[in-house]
Amino acid sequence: MPHLENVVLCRESQVSILQSLFGERHHFSFPSIFIYGHTASGKTYVTQTLLKTLELPHVFVNCVECFTLRLLLEQILNKLNHLSSSEDGCSTEITCETFNDFVRLFKQVTTAENLKDQTVYIVLDKAEYLRDMEANLLPGFLRLQELADRNVTVLFLSEIVWEKFRPNTGCFEPFVLYFPDYSIGNLQKILSHDHPPEYSADFYAAYINILLGVFYTVCRDLKELRHLAVLNFPKYCEPVVKGEASERDTRKLWRNIEPHLKKAMQTVYLREISSSQWEKLQKDDTDPGQLKGLSAHTHVELPYYSKFILIAAYLASYNPARTDKRFFLKHHGKIKKTNFLKKHEKTSNHLLGPKPFPLDRLLAILYSIVDSRVAPTANIFSQITSLVTLQLLTLVGHDDQLDGPKYKCTVSLDFIRAIARTVNFDIIKYLYDFL
């Protein structure tokens, strides 16, 4: 369809395969289709656009929002019921608790005149969350066409491969369709398609080319690149607006935007500030080369003990384990730094990067640097989990490892010094590299 080619860019092959699988409205389609690919590879957009453009009866459900079996099944049934009763405008809420009830109610809903002779499509986005629900749910959806004896196709959209889904007991195999990552040429074409009407397509394409030249090595997420393109474009065309350069003066435009793109690279994915705050920061910033206001330690707020946990984690990451006695025991005797040095330790630990440490060592350092007695309560452990969620600590290894969890501290020296100052702790005195 020519209309689809203009709306769905760089996914012609996938659209063609899906159209051939869907077939005619009254034909029985493939019972289940598994679509997978990395984030922002167009899975959801292509599927929704295709179903809407072809005006096929479908329901779209996000498995993150419907996090229980009952929520998921009721959402599907009520959306289908709304489709079937759209003509008379009245519909009642359906309740459903088991998959057996779902099959029975699904048969009733799809007997409506406008759903009877055509394929109904159920789209389950973020389908990887189905694995955390009841064991019979995934095999049931894969065989829904057979169980309900209805013309229905279930589409699973996921970021992980089918092999991670397949139950050990076996199941009906879906048709698997892969959405590859967009190439740099694809991204150039898609992003250039968004050009503002007040500027020429060539001018915006040149800007996108510069943007991808800076960000493509660190970010290939279409959503993030599109956000960055919108955010930084006013700064790129600023010399043109002021009359200081023409649209073809790419060298001058590049010199103007370069420091701001470098600054934006520090916050890819982070969303530390809103778009409006970013624009205000660009207007107020007299020194574009300085990374002002974007560092997390300028506005991060942590509970009192979380700060000490983070400090203890930093010390555990950057101090050799055998130096703990020197720093944290009162009667350790006089030990010179030269006694610790080995040939491979001539390089600073800060240059080598953070090293993993066990939970026991973290707690031992925490108890020695906090003045008051801290009991190892659930509150302390929940604060450690919160620091992992905030990505100030990272969990190293697998959750099911037998020797207990290991962590790494991911913050910089400037960050931890700023945190330490808020609790009057001189962290430099406790760092092996600064002896």
Swiss-Prot record:
GO biological processes: DNA replication; DNA replication initiation; regulation of DNA replication
Tissue: Abundant in spleen, ovary, prostate, testis, and colon mucosa.
GO molecular function: ATP binding; DNA replication origin binding; nucleotide binding
GO cellular component, as recorded: chromatin; chromosome, telomeric region; cytosol; nuclear origin of replication recognition complex; nucleoplasm; nucleus; origin recognition complex
Main subcellular location: nucleus
Swiss-Prot/TrEMBL keywords: ATP-binding, Chromosome, DNA replication, Nucleotide-binding, Nucleus, Ubl conjugation
Binding positions (ATP): G37, H38, T39, A40, S41, G42, K43, T44
Presence of keyword ATP-binding: yes
Pfam assignment, any one: AAA_16
Subcellular location(s) of the protein: Nucleus; Chromosome
Subunit structure: Component of ORC, a complex composed of at least 6 subunits: ORC1, ORC2, ORC3, ORC4, ORC5 and ORC6. ORC is regulated in a cell-cycle dependent manner. It is sequentially assembled at the exit from anaphase of mitosis and disassembled as cells enter S phase.
Function field: Component of the origin recognition complex (ORC) that binds origins of replication. DNA-binding is ATP-dependent. The specific DNA sequences that define origins of replication have not been identified yet. ORC is required to assemble the pre-replication complex necessary to initiate DNA replication.
Protein name per Swiss-Prot or TrEMBL: Origin recognition complex subunit 5
Organism for this UniProt entry: Homo sapiens
